[in-house]
Curated annotation (Swiss-Prot):
Zinc finger residue extent: C2H2-type: 314-338, 483-507
Keywords: Chaperone, Cytoplasm, Metal-binding, Nucleus, Phosphoprotein, Repeat, Zinc, Zinc-finger
Name of protein: DnaJ homolog subfamily C member 21
Any one Gene Ontology cellular component term annotated for this protein: cytosol
Source species taxonomy: Eukaryota, Metazoa, Chordata, Craniata, Vertebrata
Subunit structure: Interacts with HSPA8, PA2G4 and ZNF622.
Modified residues (Phosphoserine): S283, S302, S370, S512
Location relative to the cell: Cytoplasm; Nucleus; Nucleus, Nucleolus
Biased composition (Acidic residues): 281-290
One Pfam family of this chain: DnaJ
Occurrences of domain J (ranges): 3-69
InterPro entries: Chaperone_stress_response, DnaJ_domain, DnaJ_domain_CS, J_dom_sf, Matrin/U1-like-C_Znf_C2H2, Znf_C2H2_jaz, Znf_C2H2_sf, Znf_C2H2_type
Amino acid sequence: MKCHYEALGVRRDASEEELKKAYRKLALRWHPDKNLDNAAEAAEQFKLIQAAYDVLSDPQERAWYDNHREALLKGGLDGEYQDDSLDLLHYFTVTCYSGYGDDERGFYAVYRVVFELIAKEELECMSEGDVEDFPTFGDSQSDYDTVVHPFYAHWQSFCTQKNFSWKEEYDTRQASNRWEKRAMEKENKKIRDRARKEKNELVRQLVAFIRKRDKRVQAHRKLVEEQNAEKARKAEEMRRQQKLKQAKLAEQYREQSWMTMANLEKELQEMEARYEKEFGDGSDENEVEDQEPRNGLDGKDSEEAEEAELYQDLYCPACDKSFKTEKAMKNHEKSKKHREMVALLKQQLEEEEEQFSGVQMDENVLNANSEEEMEDTPKQKLSKKQKKKKQKSAQNFDDNFNENGTEEGGKIAPEKTKSNEDNAKELENRPQENTCITETTEACEDPKSEAKSVPKSKGKKTKDVKKSVKAPAEAQPVSDVLISCATCHSEFPSRNKLFDHLKATGHARAPSATASLNSVTRNKKEKRRSR
């Protein structure tokens, strides 16, 4: 069978106009009426031209013909197709060549012909615009970079241009409808892709087989290994020389004068002396003592004793810190934090001393006024803010107490109740008691408390009782407060004056328990009588 494009004498990518012109020209030439001398041959040729134009003028027929052109030319689609392509399996053995020379049976000549045939088959399946150059296999003397490497780089990624349409099982022209045609095309496409994949893998495996036995590749690999070994040897030699050079420099190295510790210590001492002279820290005597060498006692015991004395001299009890040098101790004593800690320590000591001196005086007052005994709470260390608050609260309490005492003393009338007079006389007649403070207890009590103490009852009698309670409370004049010392019987206008007197004279002594109990019981009896 002759190719339709060859019958019309056009290229495979010819347009419709070119096909029409070629057909008219050949039809006039081979028409039987114009070839009476050779009518049989002209009729046969005219049939081929007519059939070719009929197929190529129809777009669908032309597309199908392009896809199945190779199969049609080699026997058709009826199963009579014979694949005349090169059998590559024959070249996977070492018996296909003899030696690695350049003769006809040599390794390079045999495989050079094989790849030229494969390239020729691929060019037949390509269009004129898609033609590409296939690198040659070369010979035994070919250069690796210009011939061998490009050849293997191309053929190791080989991809055939054949469509393998002769492998199709279904003729889409015989489909009854378009759905059946699509199903046929889908199955045919799977078959073609499978055949194309097998062809590509076969060629790539052949390339790998040849490359493994190619002497040019082996020589190049050996050359690369030698070059790498030479590079490693040179690198090791350079590293060894560098190490020897560094060792030699280390032997010749000398310490610079500015790096020695002796000069550094001397410069440090000079710097300290300059700063002390400028800012006034330290004295000249201390500088001389620090610069002079210390000729201490010999022996370990003398050194330990010296260190202990130095540690005691350089210890700050206020801040609970120890220092290594006298300069550091002096600088610390000049610091603001040290001065604050010293002032705080003095303040704490003064407060503790005052509290210790006033403990027994407070106990005497509490025992005289009530039966309960107050226990002293342990002293806690307070912060600055807490101490300031405590001092302010104590000062306010004393001021309020003085004001209340003087005001009440001014308001109390000179009239005294019988119970208060008895209490005062009894306290004055006690020689064993040191301190006794007699005040009008009933005058200080609130009239509301007296009114509350009256039992509730209904009727006119309760009203008379309430009036009788309110009347003496309102009409009772306020008496003066009697504050006297039980030892010397001196009277004072306020408690602060009495406390100052007790501190100065030392008359504060604890009263006997029986006397305090008798005074309390007698006061209770007098209250009951007054009710």
